Amino acid sequence: MRKKNNIKKWLLIIAGFLIICIITLFVMVSGNKVKYEGSGKSGLWMSNLEKSDKTSIGPNYFLNLYWQGSKKEEKWTVVERITLYVDGEKYQDDNVDEYDLSEYTGDEMPGGGRMEDHISTFDYMPEDEVIGHDVLVKVEWRTGQKKQTEAIKLHKKPWYKK
């Protein structure tokens, strides 16, 4: 009788441990959003597609663009155009005149709070139009009078990588 109770005790402990592991794994997998990331060859830009929390119109994504260059150049850099290509076809231009990177430094603002440290654009892209497709971001910018262009291919980031 004592042996039977001992076995039941161990089975309950093992079952409890397995339930905790399964719940933890489920939360890790389901809580993560599909994310696409990429960097330009020059190392000056990094971009990602991120799932929006605003899902009233269905699952949708937006694009983040981060400057990875020097802080000194950031103050003089202006993004003239951001273009998104899906499966080699032009999907959309950002339709904004220009982004002055001095407004996206992440620095503290005089009245309190912090500036954004990246450009967010292409809001409300439907999930089925971008996820599972080849996605490329083309950035055109100038630092002072020097104009440059960079293409950034975005790759799906696995859920287990931060």
Curated annotation (Swiss-Prot):
Entry keyword annotation includes Signal: yes
Gene name of the encoded protein: yoaO
Pfam families registered for this protein in UniProt: DUF4944
Keyword entries, A-Z: Signal
Signal peptide: 1-34
Protein name: Uncharacterized protein YoaO
Organism: Bacillus subtilis (strain 168)
